[in-house]
C-alpha cells in the first residue's frame, strides 16, 4: 500500500517500485481493474464519506498528507464539494447542490447543519 501512494510518471512497465500515475491508475503489471478502480475509491473514502444528509471530511487522512486540496468531489445527494486542508485540518469548504436540501457537514470535530439552495455555492472557512 505504501508504494501505491508513491506518485510516478514512469511510462515503461517494471515489476519494481509500483506507484500511481497522474490518472490514479496503478503503476505495476498486470493491469487489474479491481485494484485500479478500488484504490481510487479507497482514496476518495479517506477524504470524504457521505450519506444522505451527512458529509464527513478527512475521516482517514494519512499523516504524510499534511496539506492538500480536493476539487469537484461528489457527495451523496448530488452535492459537489471542494475543500482545502492545512496541517491535517480543514481550512476552507465550498459546496454546491443541484437541488434544495439540508445537510450536516462534519470536519475538525465540528458539525454544522446548512440548507443548500440549487446551484448556489456555499462557502465555509475554518481558521
Positions of PLM-derived features:
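Non-catalytic C-terminal accessory modules of carbohydrate-active enzymes
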Residues: 1-127
Amino acid at each position: 500500500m505504501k508504494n501505491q501512494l508513491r506518485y510516478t510518471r514512469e511510462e515503461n512497465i517494471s515489476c519494481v517500485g509500483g506507484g500511481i500515475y497522474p490518472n490514479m491508475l496503478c503503476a505495476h503489471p498486470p493491469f487489474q481493474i479491481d485494484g485500479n478502480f478500488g484504490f481510487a475509491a479507497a482514496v476518495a473514502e479517506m477524504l470524504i464519506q457521505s450519506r444522505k444528509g451527512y458529509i464527513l471530511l478527512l475521516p482517514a487522512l494519512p499523516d504524510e498528507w499534511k496539506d492538500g486540496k480536493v476539487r469537484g468531489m461528489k457527495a451523496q445527494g448530488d452535492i459537489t464539494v471542494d475543500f482545502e486542508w492545512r496541517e491535517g485540518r480543514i481550512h476552507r469548504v465550498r459546496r454546491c447542490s443541484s437541488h434544495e436540501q439540508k445537510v450536516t457537514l462534519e470536519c475538525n470535530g465540528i458539525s454544522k447543519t446548512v440548507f443548500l439552495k440549487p446551484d448556489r455555492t456555499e462557502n465555509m472557512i475554518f481558521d
